[in-house]
Amino acid sequence: MSQPPPPPPPLPPPPPPPEAPQTPSSLASAAASGGLLKRRDRRILSGSCPDPKCQARLFFPASGSVSIECTECGQRHEQQQLLGVEEVTDPDVVLHNLLRNALLGVTGAPKKNTELVKVMGLSNYHCKLLSPILARYGMDKQTGRAKLLRDMNQGELFDCALLGDRAFLIEPEHVNTVGYGKDRSGSLLYLHDTLEDIKRANKSQECLIPVHVDGDGHCLVHAVSRALVGRELFWHALRENLKQHFQQHLARYQALFHDFIDAAEWEDIINECDPLFVPPEGVPLGLRNIHIFGLANVLHRPIILLDSLSGMRSSGDYSATFLPGLIPAEKCTGKDGHLNKPICIAWSSSGRNHYIPLVGIKGAALPKLPMNLLPKAWGVPQDLIKKYIKLEEDGGCVIGGDRSLQDKYLLRLVAAMEEVFMDKHGIHPSLVADVHQYFYRRTGVIGVQPEEVTAAAKKAVMDNRLHKCLLCGALSELHVPPEWLAPGGKLYNLAKSTHGQLRTDKNYSFPLNNLVCSYDSVKDVLVPDYGMSNLTACNWCHGTSVRKVRGDGSIVYLDGDRTNSRSTGGKCGCGFKHFWDGKEYDNLPEAFPITLEWGGRVVRETVYWFQYESDSSLNSNVYDVAMKLVTKHFPGEFGSEILVQKVVHTILHQTAKKNPDDYTPVNIDGAHAQRVGDVQGQESESQLPTKIILTGQKTKTLHKEELNMSKTERTIQQNITEQASVMQKRKTEKLKQEQKGQPRTVSPSTIRDGPSSAPATPTKAPYSPTTSKEKKIRITTNDGRQSMVTLKSSTTFFELQESIAREFNIPPYLQCIRYGFPPKELMPPQAGMEKEPVPLQHGDRITIEILKSKAEGGQSAAAHSAHTVKQEDIAVTGKLSSKELQEQAEKEMYSLCLLATLMGEDVWSYAKGLPHMFQQGGVFYSIMKKTMGMADGKHCTFPHLPGKTFVYNASEDRLELCVDAAGHFPIGPDVEDLVKEAVSQVRAEATTRSRESSPSHGLLKLGSGGVVKKKSEQLHNVTAFQGKGHSLGTASGNPHLDPRARETSVVRKHNTGTDFSNSSTKTEPSVFTASSSNSELIRIAPGVVTMRDGRQLDPDLVEAQRKKLQEMVSSIQASMDRHLRDQSTEQSPSDLPQRKTEVVSSSAKSGSLQTGLPESFPLTGGTENLNTETTDGCVADALGAAFATRSKAQRGNSVEELEEMDSQDAEMTNTTEPMDHS
């Protein structure tokens, strides 16, 4: 019977219920504000999971949902409940955590279902696995170890009557935890009226709530177990107790219910109690009222079953009070002598096929059930209610009680049972739960018995097929379908086609499947060798830090891997220990080479040295290390003690440090892998909240407790951390010399065997304590310089400007200071507030934009700094593989595009406001560097910024916007205005210059930039070139070109994204054989060429133009000797370019210059800007010198090439572009 909807007002939705008003001062409450403010609030907040066993770091938008789901334990918490909520101001954290994990939809560990949500480290499925053991085992109070109950003289089976006075009270912070707190199956709606009546009887306080239990056919015993201890730990014992109880008291039950239950039914009733009972087909699975009555007698306490108000008023047995009528009342009391208080369960829907428990809330008043909701007794006389339930004066009763099982005891009990589970099954229950989560639930397989999952998990571990990701913690299985390995299968056929006849003495490797197989000739199948096979990537997050798992759930670590053990004294700053050679260390070792020479034999070995361990016994002992090395390579050698002493001396020399903070650990890939659930150390959390010390792409120091990153990002973090320490050491000349690799001298005072007590450097331990009087700020200029500045808490705006001026030699009036995310300008204080401190926090980053009127001294310093940073950047990024750099660039571009979309802007409009993206370390800078390399004047375009061409400026070490008609412009928010102003000015100049230089304004012009063509009709149909903008031919700056180079062929390759020019060292570049009909190349933009038919030109018109060009060239060749002789007397050398310009302009009307030439000519210059400084003024000299060296035969077959010159066509619409130069 369906329940009609409740009358208005409408009930609050289950997730989440209305809570107390939030305080405006809280960051979390600010995040929950709605309306226009909510839409404009683009802040990103972070906080820690409040579960003490989890404490994962969570990131969420301020304008997002008011409840946050933990990515580690799966619980959902209100924002007010998160610990250490603070604003994240760094864009890198936002991109790599919010966008990558939430908006990008990157595959990660699957969302945890209700069975696997962990509270205090325990999930429902974990408890279900341990429940059968708890039915037979107890815990020895003295040893804390599990012991058989019969060995403790407590019988074979756990007596559930011992829980008769226990009651679970849920913690307020867990009320809304999915899978543990409030039930989400619809019971809140179905039981609304009933719960409202209970609420009114308890002074309008919500003190009795329905909580979740899994619907797996054991919901009644799950509900009772949760009502008793809060966990589903005792469902198995309750079923066995119930079955035993019915068997022992069957005669009394048959006599009591002979009018209602036939004698033949009792066998089925008892069988249904069995934990492994499987109902016949067509019979509904579940326990009935008679079983609830039996459980009340087992527990020696009443059980009250509630329903909706309409159900309770109906004539059906939908609600009842089940009394322990077969048990004497004096045995239904607790240790205090009072009657055991009833527990309460209810139906969750009108289908009445699922039980849920109703429990009280810890810290609130015990819930009271009013008299009008107390159902009638079931199966026994009504007057027994007063005998078994203590009624209040108003006729109601208290539910549950306050004798709860302590969490500490419960966890000890679980730990003891886990040991038994390991002994019985050879696998840890948490690993079985993970197998169920990742291999069954994710594929939609439900209803699989825990025994089957346990067996499957155990076999996977024994076969070495289980792997765990160190990043997201997900399990992955190396599994290959058996049919692939049999004849006709994918791998079988591949092996046979590659190797021919398969042999039993060979192994066959399949790298794409991460599999190594042997051949079984008897069965004619391939047999996987999982011991030699290794999974290379996580199936969920695709991270490469994947390790095999043992049966006890431990991970088979490799040297350098970060473990789950906390570290309090590590210099690396990650807060966790590292695995090395079977032990866990606070730090990674330092590595240095050593050479052993003995008996004419030379051996080179690497020594791994531990020196800063909090446990001094783990520090390396120089004599032990030396002895092991000598014994390893020269075992049993007589007199090797001398070699040992030599090795000791060498090691002491290598490990002696002048600076105690010199710590350069070995670089291990994945050693500082970012993981979900990492948190800051307790020392850091005990301080006042500080910003996360994560600065920009070039200088960021990633906090490992707060990020979930890919392999590329982790590697960059490690390398940039090293770079930051190097840059700090540049401040003194002495440390500069050490950085360049000068040999360190041994100082006896610095030789030590024990751990160092010196504190870690700030960059190595970004979370190290800083005094409240100082704050360190990372400053980056738009020309690539950077520095860490220490400010006092009282530093004002003008004092900050002075600090910047001292550090970077930038006058205050040229400083534009930006901070925050998105970057906003830090304005000078208003009148009367000059003494106010600047609103910067410890760890913030600010960017200095240097205004245009920058002094020469500042430019010189910038160039020097840019050069220095560039060299260090090469040293850092040189360690990364090209694949990793490509992956990093793709991820950052993807994040940038999504963030721009969220901001409501296109990518260019958003990116031009972030100039650092076009500077060293920025994403566009990195893409160009990775794709084509960096060379001064080299042009490129990006697919994400259509219609924009960029050029590399080596002096400033940045990319600039290239506008053919106007020049190069530094990227900034106002770059579009600068371009418009420059284009307008150039157009005006171009109009005048164009009309003066040629009386004919045809389709082709020859100016100082070469031949240009009007493209007003076709230009909008041309796709911009997206490859490299290399220089064409010889880009020599000398106007007197090599005569031999002029005889080489034209460099012509149709460019599809690769270099279409040869290097200047090649003397015979490849020739492009042009076809007059369809293979003509026309240059339409810097680095852009296209076919003639693509431009839709008339072939006849082009042929006519080609002939005119041939006539022009022939005329020039015939008159060249006379022209050179008369040059000095008839005209000045500077008149020659103008005269040739007029000739070409009046003769050549359209078409491509190179197809009209009888010979091939080398090309000079490259995709340079139209207003770049070329050798225009020396054209005459170049022509004179060049033609003077030619022989008469050469004059008949070739023409002098012209240098690149500027050209503007006043009649072109909006733009002009240079053609290839001849």
Curated annotation (Swiss-Prot):
It is found in: Nucleus; Cytoplasm; Endoplasmic reticulum; Golgi apparatus, Golgi stack. SUPFAM superfamilies: Ubiquitin-like. Keywords: Acetylation, Cytoplasm, DNA damage, DNA repair, Endoplasmic reticulum, Golgi apparatus, Hydrolase, Nucleus, Phosphoprotein, Protease, Thiol protease, Ubl conjugation pathway. Residues 25-36, 755-771, 1163-1175 have a biased composition (Low complexity). The keyword Nucleus applies. It is an enzyme of class 3 (hydrolase). Residues 1-21 have a biased composition (Pro residues). The modification N6-acetyllysine is found at K408. The active site is at D216, C219, H354. Residues 1057-1074, 1143-1157, 1210-1222 have a biased composition (Polar residues). Deubiquitinating enzyme involved in DNA repair and reassembly of the Golgi apparatus and the endoplasmic reticulum following mitosis. Necessary for VCP-mediated reassembly of Golgi stacks after mitosis. Plays a role in VCP-mediated formation of transitional endoplasmic reticulum (tER). Mediates dissociation of the ternary complex containing STX5A, NSFL1C and VCP. (Microbial infection) Regulates the duration of C.botulinum neurotoxin type A (BoNT/A) intoxication by catalyzing deubiquitination of Botulinum neurotoxin A light chain (LC), thereby preventing LC degradation by the proteasome, and accelerating botulinum neurotoxin intoxication in patients. This is Deubiquitinating protein VCPIP1. It comes from Homo sapiens. The lineage of its organism: Eukaryota, Metazoa, Chordata, Craniata, Vertebrata. The gene is VCPIP1.
